[in-house]
Protein backbone atom coordinates (compact mmCIF):
# COMPACT_ATOMS: atom_id res chain seq x y z
CA UNK A 1 0.00 0.00 0.00
CA UNK A 2 1.33 3.42 -0.95
CA UNK A 3 1.64 5.92 1.89
CA UNK A 4 -0.80 8.79 2.31
CA UNK A 5 0.55 12.10 1.02
CA UNK A 6 -0.81 15.29 2.56
CA UNK A 7 -0.73 18.81 1.13
CA UNK A 8 -1.14 21.99 3.16
CA UNK A 9 -1.80 25.25 1.32
CA UNK A 10 -2.01 28.85 2.43
CA UNK A 11 -0.62 32.34 2.15
CA UNK A 12 1.74 32.02 5.16
CA UNK A 13 2.11 35.79 5.54
CA UNK A 14 3.94 35.02 7.83
CA UNK A 15 4.08 31.33 8.75
CA UNK A 16 3.45 30.81 12.49
CA UNK A 17 2.84 28.18 15.16
CA UNK A 18 -0.89 28.22 14.42
CA UNK A 19 -0.01 26.73 11.04
CA UNK A 20 2.64 24.24 12.12
CA UNK A 21 1.66 22.81 15.51
CA UNK A 22 -1.86 21.56 14.62
CA UNK A 23 -0.47 19.82 11.53
CA UNK A 24 2.31 18.21 13.57
CA UNK A 25 -0.33 16.87 15.96
CA UNK A 26 -2.45 15.75 13.01
CA UNK A 27 0.49 13.81 11.59
CA UNK A 28 0.83 11.88 14.85
CA UNK A 29 -2.91 11.24 15.06
CA UNK A 30 -3.41 9.76 11.62
CA UNK A 31 0.05 8.50 10.68
CA UNK A 32 1.42 11.07 8.24
CA UNK A 33 5.13 10.86 7.51
CA UNK A 34 5.33 13.81 5.13
CA UNK A 35 3.32 17.02 4.69
CA UNK A 36 3.98 19.16 1.63
CA UNK A 37 3.43 22.88 2.18
CA UNK A 38 2.21 24.74 -0.90
CA UNK A 39 2.30 28.54 -0.46
CA UNK A 40 -0.05 30.56 -2.67
CA UNK A 41 1.25 33.21 -5.03
CA UNK A 42 -1.94 35.15 -5.73
CA UNK A 43 -4.65 33.87 -3.35
CA UNK A 44 -8.06 34.24 -5.01
CA UNK A 45 -10.05 34.47 -1.74
CA UNK A 46 -7.92 36.95 0.21
CA UNK A 47 -6.21 40.34 -0.06
CA UNK A 48 -2.75 40.33 -1.57
CA UNK A 49 0.05 39.24 0.80
CA UNK A 50 2.17 41.94 2.43
CA UNK A 51 5.39 39.96 2.01
CA UNK A 52 6.34 39.00 -1.54
CA UNK A 53 6.41 35.40 -2.68
CA UNK A 54 10.16 34.95 -2.23
CA UNK A 55 10.06 36.38 1.29
CA UNK A 56 7.21 34.07 2.25
CA UNK A 57 9.05 31.12 0.71
CA UNK A 58 12.19 31.96 2.69
CA UNK A 59 10.23 32.26 5.95
CA UNK A 60 8.75 28.82 5.33
CA UNK A 61 12.20 27.37 4.64
CA UNK A 62 13.43 28.79 7.94
CA UNK A 63 10.38 27.51 9.82
CA UNK A 64 10.68 23.90 8.61
CA UNK A 65 14.47 23.59 8.43
CA UNK A 66 14.54 21.39 11.56
CA UNK A 67 11.20 19.67 10.94
CA UNK A 68 11.59 16.59 8.70
CA UNK A 69 7.80 16.14 8.56
CA UNK A 70 7.51 19.13 6.23
CA UNK A 71 8.66 19.78 2.69
CA UNK A 72 8.00 22.73 0.38
CA UNK A 73 6.40 22.77 -3.08
CA UNK A 74 6.86 26.01 -5.02
CA UNK A 75 4.55 25.39 -7.99
CA UNK A 76 1.93 27.95 -7.00
CA UNK A 77 4.57 30.60 -6.32
CA UNK A 78 5.75 30.21 -9.90
CA UNK A 79 2.33 31.00 -11.34
CA UNK A 80 1.46 34.54 -12.32
CA UNK A 81 -2.25 33.77 -12.07
CA UNK A 82 -4.42 33.06 -9.02
CA UNK A 83 -3.65 29.81 -7.20
CA UNK A 84 -6.57 27.40 -7.26
CA UNK A 85 -6.51 24.29 -5.09
CA UNK A 86 -8.52 22.31 -7.65
CA UNK A 87 -5.87 22.96 -10.30
CA UNK A 88 -2.97 22.06 -8.01
CA UNK A 89 -4.61 18.81 -6.89
CA UNK A 90 -5.29 17.81 -10.49
CA UNK A 91 -1.58 18.27 -11.21
CA UNK A 92 -0.59 16.25 -8.14
CA UNK A 93 -2.96 13.45 -9.05
CA UNK A 94 -1.58 13.30 -12.60
CA UNK A 95 1.98 13.17 -11.25
CA UNK A 96 1.31 10.55 -8.57
CA UNK A 97 -1.00 8.29 -10.56
CA UNK A 98 -4.51 7.07 -9.70
CA UNK A 99 -3.74 4.85 -6.70
CA UNK A 100 -1.69 7.01 -4.30
CA UNK A 101 -3.76 8.26 -1.31
CA UNK A 102 -3.69 12.05 -1.36
CA UNK A 103 -5.16 14.50 1.16
CA UNK A 104 -5.52 18.27 1.40
CA UNK A 105 -5.45 19.84 4.88
CA UNK A 106 -7.77 22.77 5.64
CA UNK A 107 -9.16 24.53 8.70
CA UNK A 108 -12.78 24.23 9.75
CA UNK A 109 -13.39 27.83 8.70
CA UNK A 110 -12.35 26.90 5.16
CA UNK A 111 -14.67 23.89 5.14
CA UNK A 112 -17.66 26.16 5.75
CA UNK A 113 -16.82 28.26 2.67
CA UNK A 114 -15.60 25.30 0.63
CA UNK A 115 -18.55 25.31 -1.84
CA UNK A 116 -17.43 28.79 -2.96
CA UNK A 117 -14.01 27.50 -4.03
CA UNK A 118 -13.17 27.23 -7.72
CA UNK A 119 -14.34 23.83 -9.05
CA UNK A 120 -14.79 22.63 -5.47
CA UNK A 121 -16.75 19.59 -6.64
CA UNK A 122 -13.66 18.23 -8.43
CA UNK A 123 -11.38 18.40 -5.40
CA UNK A 124 -12.65 15.19 -3.79
CA UNK A 125 -12.16 13.42 -7.12
CA UNK A 126 -8.44 13.91 -6.62
CA UNK A 127 -7.91 14.00 -2.85
CA UNK A 128 -9.36 13.55 0.61
CA UNK A 129 -10.06 16.57 2.81
CA UNK A 130 -8.63 16.60 6.32
CA UNK A 131 -10.29 19.31 8.39
CA UNK A 132 -8.60 20.67 11.51
CA UNK A 133 -11.41 21.38 13.96
CA UNK A 134 -11.63 24.90 15.38
CA UNK A 135 -13.67 26.06 18.38
CA UNK A 136 -16.45 28.52 17.72
CA UNK A 137 -17.23 27.23 14.24
CA UNK A 138 -20.39 25.20 13.56
CA UNK A 139 -20.18 21.62 12.39
CA UNK A 140 -22.95 22.12 9.86
CA UNK A 141 -22.77 23.65 6.41
CA UNK A 142 -24.88 26.72 5.67
CA UNK A 143 -27.18 25.07 3.11
CA UNK A 144 -28.84 21.62 3.15
CA UNK A 145 -27.34 20.45 -0.15
CA UNK A 146 -23.83 21.18 1.13
CA UNK A 147 -24.56 19.48 4.44
CA UNK A 148 -25.64 16.42 2.45
CA UNK A 149 -22.41 16.65 0.44
CA UNK A 150 -20.44 16.70 3.69
CA UNK A 151 -22.30 13.72 5.14
CA UNK A 152 -21.95 11.73 1.93
CA UNK A 153 -18.16 11.99 2.09
CA UNK A 154 -17.59 12.07 5.85
CA UNK A 155 -15.58 9.33 7.55
CA UNK A 156 -14.79 8.90 11.24
CA UNK A 157 -12.05 6.37 10.55
CA UNK A 158 -8.67 7.87 9.56
CA UNK A 159 -7.66 4.48 8.17
CA UNK A 160 -9.98 5.20 5.23
CA UNK A 161 -7.61 8.00 4.22
CA UNK A 162 -4.82 5.46 3.80
CA UNK A 163 -6.89 2.79 2.07
CA UNK A 164 -8.56 4.92 -0.63
CA UNK A 165 -6.91 7.41 -3.00
CA UNK A 166 -9.48 10.21 -2.61
CA UNK A 167 -13.07 11.14 -1.80
CA UNK A 168 -13.30 11.25 2.01
CA UNK A 169 -13.66 14.10 4.50
CA UNK A 170 -12.17 13.58 7.96
CA UNK A 171 -12.70 15.98 10.88
CA UNK A 172 -9.56 15.86 13.01
CA UNK A 173 -9.37 16.81 16.68
CA UNK A 174 -6.29 19.03 16.59
CA UNK A 175 -5.23 21.67 19.13
CA UNK A 176 -6.32 25.24 18.50
CA UNK A 177 -3.80 28.06 18.83
CA UNK A 178 -5.27 31.54 18.99
CA UNK A 179 -2.70 32.84 16.54
CA UNK A 180 -3.27 34.41 13.16
CA UNK A 181 -1.05 36.15 10.64
CA UNK A 182 -3.25 39.23 11.07
CA UNK A 183 -2.56 39.31 14.82
CA UNK A 184 1.17 38.93 14.20
CA UNK A 185 1.25 41.72 11.61
CA UNK A 186 -0.67 44.04 13.94
CA UNK A 187 1.64 43.30 16.86
CA UNK A 188 4.72 43.90 14.73
CA UNK A 189 3.29 47.20 13.49
CA UNK A 190 2.73 48.20 17.13
CA UNK A 191 6.20 47.13 18.21
CA UNK A 192 4.85 44.31 20.40
CA UNK A 193 6.58 41.00 21.05
CA UNK A 194 5.79 37.98 18.85
CA UNK A 195 8.37 35.57 20.24
CA UNK A 196 5.76 33.06 21.39
CA UNK A 197 3.82 33.10 18.11
CA UNK A 198 6.28 31.97 15.44
CA UNK A 199 9.69 30.27 15.11
CA UNK A 200 12.66 32.37 16.18
CA UNK A 201 14.47 32.22 12.78
CA UNK A 202 11.32 33.53 11.08
CA UNK A 203 11.02 36.44 13.52
CA UNK A 204 14.71 37.27 13.07
CA UNK A 205 14.25 37.35 9.29
CA UNK A 206 11.14 39.55 9.59
CA UNK A 207 13.09 42.03 11.70
CA UNK A 208 16.09 41.96 9.35
CA UNK A 209 13.86 42.63 6.34
CA UNK A 210 11.72 45.22 8.10
CA UNK A 211 8.54 43.35 7.17
CA UNK A 212 5.05 44.20 8.44
CA UNK A 213 6.00 47.63 9.74
Curated annotation (Swiss-Prot):
Pathway: Cofactor biosynthesis; NAD(+) biosynthesis; deamido-NAD(+) from nicotinate D-ribonucleotide: step 1/1. GO terms for biological process: NAD biosynthetic process. It catalyses: nicotinate beta-D-ribonucleotide + ATP + H(+) = deamido-NAD(+) + diphosphate. One of its GO terms (molecular function) is nicotinate-nucleotide adenylyltransferase activity. Pfam families: CTP_transf_like. InterPro entries: Cyt_trans-like, NadD/NMNAT, Rossmann-like_a/b/a_fold. Its EC number is 2.7.7.18. Keywords: ATP-binding, NAD, Nucleotide-binding, Nucleotidyltransferase, Pyridine nucleotide biosynthesis, Transferase. Catalyzes the reversible adenylation of nicotinate mononucleotide (NaMN) to nicotinic acid adenine dinucleotide (NaAD). NCBIfam families: cyt_tran_rel (TIGR00125), nicotinate (nicotinamide) nucleotide adenylyltransferase (TIGR00482), PRK00071.1-1 (NF000839), PRK00071.1-3 (NF000840). Belongs to the NadD family. This is Probable nicotinate-nucleotide adenylyltransferase. The lineage of its organism: Bacteria, Pseudomonadati, Pseudomonadota, Gammaproteobacteria, Enterobacterales. The gene is nadD.
Amino acid sequence: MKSLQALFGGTFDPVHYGHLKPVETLANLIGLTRVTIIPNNVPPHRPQPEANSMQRKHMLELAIADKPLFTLDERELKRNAPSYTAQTLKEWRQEQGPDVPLAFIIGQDSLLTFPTWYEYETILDNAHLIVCRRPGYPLEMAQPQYQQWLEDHLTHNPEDLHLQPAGKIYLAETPWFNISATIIRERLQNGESCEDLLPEPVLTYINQQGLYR
